[in-house]
């Protein structure tokens, strides 16, 4: 069928469906000859079965009619007008009125188009092959076995830190794991040292032909380099992750690019000094009003359940996170890379606390504020320009050392 003729009707009395159908056939018969006789058209398959829905209300009958039509547009319009001319059903006066003529093919086409859009959308959302994830999965079986603990401080390190003439120094265990994943085995971590670099790193650096400090692309990386130099660690070259990125999250290509762009220490320090001088001159040249700086660190007092404390001790180096509800009940364990999409999928107020082995970033803080998350506990705090008032943040060091 091409069209559905839809009409509504009212009858000044109580009638049955058969009465309505009989009135339609009877009062349209021979109006335009046999060619437009409804029974003949039904027999030839040009019209479908008449569908009647009827209701009684206050001694009257009302309802809707659908007449499927396989005629052309002009003939279908004529049939609709013929049915509208029916003014009696049985002994009662009646009124038939056209609601619409629905183009079934157009509606079917709309449904097909909408379905095609849905198929395309779900197809686009399907996980495409991510080479990094493939490498991660393949290497996960060996990465834990390859990582070693070096020196009396039990520092995370690759298996070749002793025998390789070159050494890569990174900040934390997660950085070591990521470099091992891509085949860099001459790597050792200072474990986020901010005041005293382990003596093992100092002595090991002096035994190596070339030492590379490979650090995060944020202020934290600047601080680690400063501590390395102030503790007399031998540094020959400096490599940095892209601005705002962490070594632990880089792909193999990004690691290779960062290391290929490393600079000799003297050249790097000169570049930094020139940049600082340029900034200083620019600031002096401008007359600016004093700016009131907000305190960036707030005192957070909270009692953590024992099971959460135990979980925090296990997380470093796993690149995993845990989501808790308002009562510190476990909601889900996730990979660090999946935390933001997971949070976006949850309803507001569902997650109250996040504990994860990763960097607390501005993007994560903004999303947490939007989702009414109370607290984030992470491995480190990245470059944060604006701290939401409704989200407390702590690091593993804050928890474990307290």
UniProtKB/Swiss-Prot annotation:
Pfam families linked: Toprim_4
Enzyme class, UniProt record, top EC level: transferase
PROSITE patterns: TOPRIM
Residues the record lists as binding Mg(2+) 1: 171, 216
Entry keyword rRNA processing: no
Molecular functions per Gene Ontology: DNA-directed RNA polymerase activity; metal ion binding; poly(A) binding
A GO biological process held by the record: DNA replication, synthesis of primer
Name of protein: DNA primase DnaG
